[in-house]
Amino acid sequence: MKSLVLLLCLAQLWGCHSAPHGPGLIYRQPNCDDPETEEAALVAIDYINQNLPWGYKHTLNQIDEVKVWPQQPSGELFEIEIDTLETTCHVLDPTPVARCSVRQLKEHAVEGDCDFQLLKLDGKFSVVYAKCDSSPDSAEDVRKVCQDCPLLAPLNDTRVVHAAKAALAAFNAQNNGSNFQLEEISRAQLVPLPPSTYVEFTVSGTDCVAKEATEAAKCNLLAEKQYGFCKATLSEKLGGAEVAVTCMVFQTQPVSSQPQPEGANEAVPTPVVDPDAPPSPPLGAPGLPPAGSPPDSHVLLAAPPGHQLHRAHYDLRHTFMGVVSLGSPSGEVSHPRKTRTVVQPSVGAAAGPVVPPCPGRIRHFKV
C-alpha cells in the first residue's frame, strides 16, 4: 500500500513538472513602493504632462496596483494604476513637475486616476496604453477644510470670460512688447465677499505691438510661439470694476518639424482660437507619441466648433482615452486580464502584521 501511495505521489510530481507553462500566463506583483514600480509610475506621469494640451501638470500621489507580465520574445509589460494630483504649473510652463507645487485642498484640489501599460525593454520604459480621468474634490470636502473658500467656477461662465478679457486688455495696455491674445481659460473661482472673480488663463504672442494694436483680427501669431500664463482678479466696486493682473511670459518655442502619425493632420484641428469666445477643451488628442520621445513644443488645439461644455476643469479623459499608443515597439500587446495565475514576491517569516504590497504610500494627501 505504501508503495502504491509513493507511486501516485511521484506521478503527480512528474505531471506538475512536465506541464507546459505558456508564455505570459504568470504575472508577478511587486511592491507598489519598489523603486522599479515608482520608475514606471514616473514615466507615466511624464507621459501625461508631455501630451496634455490643456490645463495643468499632474504629479504622482499614490500607486494603487501593479502587475508585471513577461513578454515574448523579451521584455516585461507593467500594468499599473496610479492616482495623481493637479499642480499649480500650467502645461506650457517649462518648470519640471518635481518643482511644481501641488494644489492644496482649500484651493479646490483636482485628482486624477490613471491606468497605464508600459513596456520595459533593455531597462527602458515606453507607454503603450494610457487611460485617465480627473475630477475636482467635492464641495463638501472643501468646506470641511475651509468654510469660506471659493469653489471652482465653470470656465464658460460669463463673469469668468469677462474677467479674463478685461485682465488681458489691462496686461496689453501695460505691455511694451507684443500684443497678446487669449488662448485658454484654465481655472476660475467666484469670490462672494468682497465680490470678485479670480481667473487663470494663457495667452499667445502676436506680430502686433501691444500699444499699437487696435484690431486683434489683423494680428497673427508669432512663427516662434510665445506663450504666457496669467493670474487675475476682477473686483466689483462702487466706482466700477478694478482689475489686478500678473503674467509670466515663457521663452519662445521654435516650430517643430517632427513627423506626425499617418492621419494625424486630419484628426487634429487647426490651432486657431477665437479671442471673442471662451476656449473649450478638446474632445481628444489622437496620435499621442510614446513616452521617452523628445518633448515637442506644446500645440494648443482649437476646440471643435460649437463645443461649449459647462465644466470647471479640463478632464484628463478627453486626452487619455485608453487607445493603444502608436509608438508601441511592437504591433501587439498581450491581454493579461484573461489569466489568473499570480506570483507574489517572497516574504520571509517575521513577527508582527504583514504589510500589503499595495496600495503604496500617499505622497501628498488623499482627495
Swiss-Prot record:
SUPFAM superfamilies: Cystatin/monellin (SSF54403)
Record's signal peptide: 1-18
InterPro entries in UniProt: Cystatin_dom, Cystatin_Fetuin_A, Cystatin_sf, Kininogen_Fetuin_HRG, Prot_inh_fetuin_CS
Tissue expression per record: Synthesized in liver and selectively concentrated in bone matrix. Secreted in plasma. It is also found in dentin in much higher quantities than other plasma proteins.
Subcellular location: Secreted
Consequence the record notes for mutating R317C: In allele AHSG*3
Record GO terms (molecular function): cysteine-type endopeptidase inhibitor activity; endopeptidase inhibitor activity; kinase inhibitor activity
CDD domains recorded: CY
Compositionally biased tracts (Pro residues): 276-293
GO cellular component terms, A-Z: blood microparticle; collagen-containing extracellular matrix; endoplasmic reticulum lumen; extracellular exosome; extracellular matrix; extracellular region; extracellular space; Golgi apparatus
Limits of the Cystatin fetuin-A-type domain: 27-133, 144-255
Gene3D superfamilies named in the record: 3.10.450.10
Quaternary structure annotation from Swiss-Prot or TrEMBL: Alpha-2-HS glycoprotein derives from this precursor, when the connecting peptide is cleaved off. The two chains A and B are held together by a single disulfide bond.
Protein family (similarity comment): Belongs to the fetuin family.
The protein's name: Alpha-2-HS-glycoprotein
Native species: Homo sapiens
